[in-house]
Design a protein with these regions (language model features):
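Small-residue helix-packing and pore-constriction motifs in hydrophobic alpha-helices
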Residues: 2-55, 65-73, 80-94, 100-132, ...
Length: 186
């Protein structure tokens, strides 16, 4: 009886491993549909994504999905895996999913006409906002997406927008409500 329980556990683990490998293969194929494979071959992207997964402890499928999302949001293929690495760091420090970190960073980059290489500085700004206010980067990522394009259009830089969120939330205004106030003011 003990052997059959152990066999069942081994079979379940094997099945889960096969599923993860299949999901990762699908995610890499998806990256290949948007990547500039002339600048970075798919094999190199795959190797870099696996390396980032190992370094960060995040699943390879999650890294591949985030890479697809980053490239789809206009991050150059050559910069995508590094950008995702920065996004993983923001996700860990800001209490959010990697996909949400990619989303908020690409929203800022696209709205302000910045580069993927600015992701580290932008992550620092978001973490500083979290530290100075009563908010998390997760809450900011859900609220800022509606405000960033307007702020950019009206010449309000990301530093001032972030400081506004920090000040409002520090004074007891919920992050979502702060976004509504800022959007109305703009």
């Amino acid at each position: 009886k003990k052997v059959s329980v152990a066999s069942a556990a081994s079979a379940a683990a094997l099945g889960a491993s096969v599923k993860l490998a299949s999901d990762y293969t699908d995610a890499v194929a998806k990256v290949g549909t948007v990547a500039d494979l002339q600048s970075v071959p798919l094999e190199k992207l795959r190797d870099d994504m696996l390396q980032l997964s190992t370094e960060t402890g995040r699943g390879a499928g999650e890294i591949a999905d985030a890479t697809y999302q980053a490239i789809s949001a206009s991050v150059d293929t050559a910069d995508a895996v590094s950008f995702v690495g920065t996004s993983v760091g923001l996700a860990k420090a800001g209490f959010l999913e990697t996909a949400d970190a990619v989303d908020v960073l690409t929203t800022i980059i696209n709205a302000y006409g910045l580069e993927a290489s600015d992701a580290g500085r932008l992550s620092d700004i978001l973490i500083q906002t979290q530290n100075d206010g009563k908010t998390t980067v997760n809450e900011l990522s859900q609220s800022m997406g509606q405000v960033i394009p307007l702020a950019s259009a009206y010449g309000v830089n990301i530093e001032n927008l972030a400081a506004s969120y920090a000040q409002l939330t520090k004074n007891g205004v919920a992050t979502a409500q702060a976004g509504t106030y800022l959007k109305s003011m703009l």
